[in-house]
Structures are given as C-alpha cells and as structure tokens.
Swiss-Prot record:
Allows the formation of correctly charged Asn-tRNA(Asn) or Gln-tRNA(Gln) through the transamidation of misacylated Asp-tRNA(Asn) or Glu-tRNA(Gln) in organisms which lack either or both of asparaginyl-tRNA or glutaminyl-tRNA synthetases. The reaction takes place in the presence of glutamine and ATP through an activated phospho-Asp-tRNA(Asn) or phospho-Glu-tRNA(Gln). GO terms for molecular function: asparaginyl-tRNA synthase (glutamine-hydrolyzing) activity; ATP binding; glutaminyl-tRNA synthase (glutamine-hydrolyzing) activity. This is Aspartyl/glutamyl-tRNA(Asn/Gln) amidotransferase subunit B. HAMAP family: GatB. The lineage of its organism: Bacteria, Bacillati, Bacillota, Bacilli, Bacillales. Gene3D superfamilies: 1.10.10.410, GatB domain, N-terminal subdomain (1.10.150.380).
Amino acid sequence: MNLETIIGLEVHVELKTNSKIFSASPTEFGAEPNTQTSVIDLGYPGVLPTLNKEAVNFAMKAAMALNCDIATETKFDRKNYFYPDNPKAYQISQFDKPIGENGWIEIEVDGKKKRIGITRLHLEEDAGKSTHTADGSLVDYNRQGMPLIEIVSEPDMRTPEEAYAYLEKLKSIIQYTGVSDCKMEEGSLRCDANISLRPVGQEKFGTKAELKNLNSFTYVQKGLEHEQVRQEKELLSGGIIQQETRRYDEATKKTILMRVKEGSDDYRYFPEPDLVELYIDDEWKEAVRASIPELPDARKARYVAELGLPAYDAHVLTLTKEMSDFFEATVADGADAKLTSNWLMGEVLAYLNKQQKELKDVALTPAGLSKMVQLIEKGTISSKIAKKVFNELIEKGGDPEEIVKAKGLVQISDEGTLRKVVTEILDNNEQSIEDFKNGKDRAIGFLVGQIMKATKGQANPPLVNKILLEEINKR
C-alpha cells in the first residue's frame, strides 16, 4: 500500500502594536512578570474591552499580503475554556467570520513551485505564560491580551520539506509587511502542525496527529519527519492511528504523546457580547492596501530583472527584509550588485550563522561594505586582502580605506615591483619552471604561492599570473 502524507499548519503571529488588542496595556517583551497587565486583561467584573484599531489594520495588512479575501463584516467570539494562564476562562477570538479567508502563498522546493492555500486568518488575544517548577507553577500575565493573528493553512503540504518552505516564506512575507518581527525565541511566532497519512488516491483524510511545542522551523520539519515514519509503520503493520496531541523531543529525536483526543474540542463559541460587529468598507481596505510595501517575490523579480542577479542570489537575499534592505543600501551607495551579493551570501552569512547573530547586532554597515567592495573593484585590494578588512569591519566597524592604510594592506599593482619579485622567485625555483614546461600545471600554483608569500598576500593576482607566464616564456 502506497501512502501519501497530508500536512496542515496553524501559525500564531504576535502583532507589533504599542498596546494590547483590547486594553491600553503596553506590549514590551522582557518586562518583569505581571507588570504589563490591567483589569481588562485579567477580566475583572464590570470592565469592557476596547478594540485596538491598529491591530485590525495589521491583521488586514497581513491578510492582504497573503492574498486573502478581506471580510466586509467581521465579529469577535468567546472561546470558552479554563486554564490557569487564561484568567477570564474564555478567550476573545473569531469563529465564523474571520477577517481574511481564501488566501495562498507560493513556495519552491527542489526547483518546483507550488501554491499552498490559506484557509483563514483571524484576530484573537493571547493567553498568559505558565512556568512549571519543582515548587509549583507560576503564571505571568504580561502576554495575556497581546494581539495575535492565527493563520490556518489548507492541508496542501505533502512533505516536511514543503512545511519548512511554507513557514520560511510565511515568516518572510509577514516581516516585510512590518506587522510582526516573527521571533520564535520570543514567542512572537508559534506553530502547531497537523499530519496524517492516507492511501494514494483516497480522498478521505486519515486520522491526524497534532504536533505542539515546536520552537523552530527545524523542529517542525524534524517532528513531521518522525511522525510521518511512525504513522507509516503503524498503518503498514495493520494498526490504526489515534487522534493525539504530541510534542517533538530533540533529545530522543522522536515525537512523544502528550494526550489522546477522543473527539474535537467543544469551546462553546458564542458572539462576544461586549464588542459590536466590525464593518470594513472599501475605503478602509484600500488605505491599508496602499501601506503594503514591496513583498519578497516582487523584490526578488526586480533583483533579477534590473540588477542582473541570478535567481538563487535573489532568493537568498530576499529571505529576510533585514538582509534585503542591507543589500539595497550597499548597492545604492555605489557597490556592484553581484559582488555585494557574493559577500553577503558568503562571508557575512557565514559570520552571522557562526556567531548566532543578526545584522543589527554587528558593526558592519552598508556604507562600510560598499566602500570595501569598491576598493576591490578598483584593484586597491584583492579579495583575499578584503577578508582581513571585512573581519575588522564586522567586529569593530570603521572606514575600509583607513583600515587598509593602517594595516598596510594596499594591493601591489606596480608592474615593475612585481616583475622584480617574480624574477627572484623564478631564479630560486628552476625545477618548478621545468615541471611547468613539461606539462605539470601544479607547478604554476606553487610559484604563485611563493610570490604571494613574498608579498604577504598583497600582490595583484591577475597581474602576477600575466608577469609569471611572460617571465617563464623568456627562459
């Protein structure tokens, strides 16, 4: 029996508003526990919520960027459940009239493009955060009432790789809109995954498992990969899949049962009595649409068409708005687009990944990188020397020209000076000359290495090759 995998994702994104969705409480991350709450957030008797218009604008902006249809009439509902981090015993969410529906984004895996549907995007308030210790449980209500959008995908993904690509693309689009920073480590982007298997050709979905507590895109992919194998093994051996909630454990590289779900949750939704229905007219929609900046796909196409970048470069550079904006500022300052792309995708990304940092955390600036790239273009420094300059720029900042002068890194491009060095090296390596003339191409590499060593890596490589061949041919 051949089985196919069905994957759908539910993503919660915290909106970057200055106040909470139904109160004036601040939203700063990292504040002391329970210092950013109010009687409205905690559901004291007699208090009434007031809808934050900026949260609605942000939700509309995200929905439009995800190609959703925007509702003309929408409303809020009470989702009833009891849990210590939910002091009101209900959550204000949206049930049957979400703010956005029928959206999609396009992903690419192994060179193949695929459209993933988005069922709905709705607004809701976040819950508090529980911390469990040996002495008991603690609850921080700072997060209670934070504005969230929940983005529910269609079950259109067939592999864990597609799920990873979907999350990467979704995060990129949301970051470009500016409505959220999507930092998983701070909880501003959270994901639950639903996965089931069914025989190829069957229309009915199999019984799904829900994966929770997935705190990175890599964990989402790994969790789905393990769950895919677990369910396949169970089904092929004649077993049945139970509807379960599971979590991915990095230590064991397995998904672990959290609880069995005997039926669907009954949250007894009913319309929120303290909030009126919301009507969104065309004028409001168009005002929000006009605020949407250039999104990653459009920017990627522009890089290829106008800057002549390869599609791969354009894809990597536009994955995050931070990197793309840095690239644009560097090129706008006069640097060559392709050379800038090479440095950002190579040395810069390697450094950031190794140090676990973002561009905003390092001393490198677009102006600094631009000036360094232009020094390479002019032949003032070689790419090899530029790495020494780069290390200084990204660690301490500064002016590339001043760094080159202070460290004596100016490339030697004077033909007379280089010819003298080449002649001296050849005089001391006659055997290498003979080896080269006898077809041993490695000999030329050895000679170039000796010249670079003698000039402390500052010789102009193309000029060295030219002079070296000229001098060898004279002998």
